[in-house]
Amino acid sequence: MAQSVSGYSVGIDLGTTYSCVGVWQNDRVEIIANDQGNRTTPSYVAFTDTERLIGDAAKNQVAMNAHNTVFDAKPLIGRKFSDPIVQADIKHWPFKLTSGWRQAQIVVQFKGESKTFQPEEISSMVLIKMREVAEAFIGKEVKNAVITVPAYFNDSQRQATKDAGAIAGLNVLRIINEPTAAAIAYGLDKKGGERNVLIFDLGGGTFDVSLLSIEEGIFEVKSTARDTHLGGEDFDNRLVDHFTQEFKRKHRKDITENQRALRRLRTACERAKRTLSSSAQAYIEIDSLFDGIDFNSTITRARFEDMCGDYFRKTMEPVAPVLRDAKLSKSQVHEVVLVGGSTRIPKVQQLLSDFFNGKEPNKSINPDEPVAYGATVQAAILSGNDSSQKLQDLLLLDVTPLSLGLETAGGVMTTLIARNTTVPTKKSQTFSTYADNQPGVLIQLFEGERSMTRDNNLLGKFNLDGIPPMPRGVPQIDVTFDIDANGIFNVSAVEKSTGKENKITITNDRVVCRRHDIDRMVSEAEKYKSEDEANKIRIEAKNGLENYSYNLRNTLNDEKLKDQIPEDDKKAIEDKVTETINWLDANQSAEKEEYEGKQKELEGIANPILQKMYAAAGAAGGMPGGMPGMPGGMPGMPGGMPGMPGGMPGGMPGGMPGGWPPCWSSDQGPKIEEVD
């Protein structure tokens, strides 16, 4: 059902390595190019002594500022610093990570200070960039968005993504799974009978496989499986390791000591990987890579396929379980749709084709764009734009990626909502006490497929107190699990005889204390937005003074004019121009008013002299050949704003250096047991 929303709505694919945004216009999806003309934007955020850069501008300067350029923030959401995946990736990240109470945190130097950010804060900055890309295209404010997440994202990661949207000033209409969004892109115009479609989504850092049935506008997810840490960046890492060893072998030098050299090599490896999707061989050429040594090498497609063979074979592992869960055979799959840039790799396509007995994958849609495309369609529907014939009767039925349950006596996982259950959904079950006269119960909530809770992921917990003294097994406690359309998980428990009730929205240990943190981040975003705007105006004033000074110098040196100005006047202007340029070089961070004051000083000397010259020329019949090199104009306009490439208002330095404080106590508490 459409929501009552104001303002424009967009669909955003918030990717690990690249992000993409679309809007519904003229009865179709428009995937929007950014200010560099690219339809995907790097999910990079860089911090310097003066500004924050996002997207292409951040990625372009990463070799020079590696320690303060953050990427891959998405997989960090909801992962602790001690997580094996985080520890395995640290060696590939030049930026610093530290351990927060809830998850790993990112530490950078920004404007001369050490700042700590949560991963969702970095994601919110990328979302701000995508919103601004859309606003530049539409010409109006964007207020609402549908944002996609990997199908394997757990409840807390989905909530954190929603939080990132809120910090970015967006009303998040819905969080939807990436493979489901891609299926919409494939099936929007498909009419006719039921079709079973396998979405094979291999991106930069995530991998999902989903099986959907599409029939007359109804998209129903039958099953989903994933590898939570597999993608194009793993292939890049193999190439980097290969060439690092080659450089060491040839030159007896270890480039892993130098982050700038490593970053330049990684960029070249990513380019080579892309080349190998269409060519049998790729060349690596990097001038002065390390200690003044030029590095040249080649890599063949066969060698690349061999070094990444285990990863490529790993992409096939989730496919069979997805078919099994959906109760379908290979022959019953009508289409295999490729999503994500890494599906361009020929070996991946070949393995997939071999698995489906020679059936070729569908390559009719650009693998970089279908996720944003599907999110845009969903945004159009949810914002009430369903008057379009194409959008009418379209229904999206997603599933929960993991089983949800609670701990009963003995640490047993009792499942209430099974994996691949269609959402939204609601399920209740009755439990009782484990001991006589037990005054309360501790309800611990888990997600996962293992029989014991210790092997699953703890989502949250809460107490239900005030149970009257009764023998064990007598109290009747109704526990209800409720998952909404965003996949957000709500749990309530009621003791029947007293009506005592308690409930929780599972947001990964973030019940009440989380809200004020989000509010603080939002207010910081507003604060730094105005600060960034002021910095933008300051740089415009600096550029205006610089352009005025150099234009004035060019005017004095112009062949047609230099003889028209008396030497004393010319020297007065030249001395003041030189003084101003020297002052500019020494005062790159001055205030707007200082730049404007310096420009007025320069104008005070130059304007009377130039006016006298032009007046004399006018009396003599005009300036020969016109008046080239007129200084001045509009300060801040000539040459654009070189100091702000891709920089975006709304930064949120500061973070939360100590991590979030705990909201509830230890694991100890009275147990609960299942009622037969």
Curated annotation (Swiss-Prot):
One Pfam family it belongs to: HSP70
Keywords, alphabetical: ATP-binding, Chaperone, Nucleotide-binding, Stress response
Keyword ATP-binding: yes
Ranges where the record places region Disordered: 657-676
Listed GO MF terms: ATP binding; ATP-dependent protein folding chaperone
Coiled coil spans: none
UniProt record similarity statement: Belongs to the heat shock protein 70 family.
NCBIfam families linked to this entry: PRK00290.1
Protein name: Heat shock 70 kDa protein
Source organism: Bremia lactucae
